């Protein structure tokens, strides 16, 4: 870590006022404050003086989301493997199937690792696209407005994928988060000034712009051509008695739905 600290200190003059890379200072500052404690401290008549800064608060929220994220990956793989096993399908002809084969994993719903890895192959691309597309927009606005890149996007960038179905097209993932960052956050001035939730605004945009990929019965299980309604969908269409899941399943989270919405237990652990 000392080597990184020395490197950042050496680069600081180039990004400071008058330096060759002055316009890119927000990008430098984002890396510096992500790795180390921000150099600025509260001054003046602040209401609270505390060791907790925005970075620590946001990192705390990210840590709280870890149980839900892990459950999202496991349950996504479990629901898919459950269907594949019931239909006698042993291979999947896409890059995820090739990755599973390369790791020597079968599509077995009784295998924890198989479920987790297969689910991760759906969740991680969504997360990576979210962080890349949203991060670029954040960087552009910070550079133009000459203000720091806040850690709040780390939270939005994790919440957003958790609200999506596993089958969502990646280009829609990018489009949704770009819309959310711009119109739910940056137009109001950025972190601390926006009254809309970036993750939910992004999802709402996709819901109204591309309803076929984010609603209905065909998007909740990551198996081509398979349909399965959510509990809310079944209750609305046929009544509560039509829900096939037990209360224990609903509490634990091994039911269909958006990747991060199914487990009450995981949410409570994070809370």
For every predicted segment, state its role.
Residues 1-123, 127:
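N-terminal signal-anchor module of multipass membrane proteins
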Residues 61-75, 131-138, 162, 178-182, ...:
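Hydrophobic core segments of alpha-helical transmembrane domains in multi-pass membrane transport
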Residues 52, 121-124, 139-149, 165-168, ...:
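Short, amphipathic, aromatic/basic-enriched membrane-interface segments that mark the entry/exit
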Residues 116-130, 167-176, 236, 255-264:
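Structural signature of hydrophobic alpha-helical transmembrane segments
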Residues 189-268:
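Long hydrophobic alpha-helical segments that form multi-pass transmembrane helix bundles
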Residues 43-48, 133-146, 182-192, 269-271:
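C-terminal ends of transmembrane helices
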Residues 58, 62, 124-128, 151-155, ...:
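Hydrophobic alpha-helical transmembrane segments
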